[in-house]
Structures are given as C-alpha cells and as structure tokens.
C-alpha cells in the first residue's frame, strides 16, 4: 500500500479600518492511495489451465488450440503439495512459466479530495445598549466546502478474477459540496453581564438544508465565580 497526502493552505487577514477586520483562507487537501495485491490466482487463467487435452503426448490448453489464449500454461491441480494446500504447491512445482500465468498482481487505486474556502469580517457596530460598558460586536462570515472520493479497481478486480478476493469489487465515486453562512453577535449589558447569540445556515448539494442557532450569557458573580 502506498499513500500520498498533499495539503495546501493559504490565508489572508488584515484591518478594514480601526473598527473592522477580516480573515479569509483557502485549503486544498488530496490523498492518493495505491494498493497492490500480489499472487492471487486468476480464476480465468485457472479455468483455462485445467482444461487440457493430450496433443501428441503433450498436455495442451484447449484455449490455446482454439486461439483464445496463446499464453495458456497447463496446470495440474493434483501435482505435488499436501492435502488442503488448495493446489498452490502445484503452481510452484509448475515452474516460473506457470506461476507467471496463474498468479497475477492486481491493483486498486483511489483518492479523496477536500476544498475549503472560508472568511469572515468582525468588528464593532458602534451601537451601545444604555448602561453597557461597550458597544455591540458582530461577526459575519461564509464557508464553502467540497468533498470528493474515487475508488478505482483494475479490470481483473472488477471482473472478480482474483480467486482470493471473494468476488467482484466495483468502482465507486462521488462528491458533494456545502455552502454555509454564519453570524454571531456579542452584546455587553453591564460590566458583569454579556449576552451572545449566533446563527448558521448550510445548504448541501444533495438537496438538504440545515439551520442552527445559539444563545448564551456570561455573568461574573464576583472575582472568584463566573457563570456561563
């Protein structure tokens, strides 16, 4: 197995004026993987290799005589080995030519991707509740995310030709994205009490939407006790 991971992150932040600032970033992540499966016997090759006839005293594959597979090598399932070895020793005893024909390397590759673009502006609204020590603060932002994954087995794996794989493994892939908007507000009430609230809305490319809200308060009872 081989995994390669790539990640790029770019960001920019600064002040718009004395009261407002901004922060924006972009992230691109990509994970590639390659899996190699060695020495699984080919189901197709086995079926052809055991279908043998005698041609002038020489065991010959029917597939070779019919022009289906010129590389077919006869395989004696009962040659060598011990009971219960599933004929593997027969492949080994058959020599390198039989091993190369019957035992295959197969591959499954794939990747996962993620892209995120996010940003917000934050600042002082200049609006103050009567009696409050400072003005109301506000954060407004957005986030857009894209996710994708791809699973790519080779032809032999898709056909179920790997005798040790338990059957065919089909390719699959997909992606979705989500666009989000959020807002948070901080409201000083007194020197000891402040209230905060937030809202976030998300829209998914799969057709669903979600909204969430929060509200909270922070109260400083004394120098040693605070409640939130």
Located regions from the model:
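Surface-exposed, low-complexity loop segments enriched in small/polar and acidic residues
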Residues: 1-178
